[in-house]
Amino acid sequence: MARAPGGVRRRSGRRGAGGGGAGGGGEALRKGPWMAEEDEVLLEHVRTHGPMDWSSIRSKGLLPRTGKSCRLRWVNKLRPNLKSGCKFTAEEERVVIELQAQFGNKWARIATYLQGRTDNDVKNFWSTRQKRLARLLRGPLPAARPNKHNSGKGKAPSSSSLDSQTATFHQSSASLDQASLEGNSLGWQCREAAPFMGYDQACSGFFAFEGPLPLQLLPPADGEASSSNAAQSAPPPLLFDQPPYPLINFPGWPERYVDVGHGFVDAGAMDGLAYQELLPMVQSVPMIMPFFGMECAHDAVKHGAFDDLPPNMFDDAVDQPPPPPPPPPPPSPSPSPSRDDVL
């Protein structure tokens, strides 16, 4: 080192002895991505000398890379026991948390306690963990406000709301149908009716009753439930223009003229030629009273049904002239004038 005039030191000597640069050959340093040929040279150096003496790689002219670049390439990419792409295990996370509390952000030092992990792996893990904890501490994000452009009156409802409305509609319809069915099944019940005539049936042979009394349709009593279905307990309505004459039990009656579903004669069975075929059968059987369930037995009528009555029973009621009208009342006398009126 030569001293310049005036006491100022001046650096002297040749620059870059040996043809420029310590690496020999005057080759410039290379930066950027590594090539496959460079990785092969670095691996061969490690197999020969071990993972050390990184500066000698450039001094020997093996690679135009610095010692630091060669070391980082080996540690982060070329080591055989690297766990690249693997998540940290629970044990590794525990070690990183404890060592970070002890050493601080010394990632290279912490990585020496984890086999197959680099300082970059430890640093990335810690940064991701801190961000996740920050999101948890902030709590759930507030609900997004509806956009003014999308919150118009013509906004279509969501599929979930449509499904809930459809389910509610079907449930209401099912409830209404069930209530209607129960009302039809419990609305009318058959009960035995009381005798509708009060005369002595034993003394009168004009009508002959056969079988039980007819059934009358009455509304159900309070709290009374019917176990039968609607088809059994709710008879079809009576149409007065076509009275239902039960003809199923008549002997020899053709089945084609009987409505098996309700037990009544078809409405059109008496039309045309069917009338000529059914008329003898109708005349050969006793007549059935449609509403009272009574049979008119002509044989039961006695020719002398009135023999027991007294002979003069109808004398007073037959061939007697009407009684004469009563005489008119006499006229009432007019009042005589008083003495005061005359004076």
Swiss-Prot record:
The keyword Lyase does not apply. Residues 15-27 have a biased composition (Gly residues). GO terms for molecular function: DNA binding. Residues 157-169 have a biased composition (Polar residues). One of its GO terms (cellular component) is nucleus. InterPro entries: Homeodomain-like_sf (IPR009057), Myb_dom (IPR017930), Plant_Male-Germline_Reg_TFs (IPR053106), SANT/Myb (IPR001005). Residues 54-77, 107-130 bind DNA. Its main location: nucleus. Residues 1-30, 137-169, 219-238, 307-343 are annotated as: Disordered. SMART domains: SANT (SM00717). It holds the Pfam family Myb_DNA-binding. Keywords: DNA-binding, Nucleus, Repeat, Transcription, Transcription regulation. It is found in: Nucleus. Residues 320-336 have a biased composition (Pro residues). It comes from the Eukaryota. Residues 26-78, 79-134 form the HTH myb-type domain. Probable transcription factor. PANTHER family: TRANSCRIPTION FACTOR DUO1, TRANSCRIPTION FACTOR MYB58-RELATED. This is Probable transcription factor MYB58. It comes from Oryza sativa subsp. japonica (Rice).
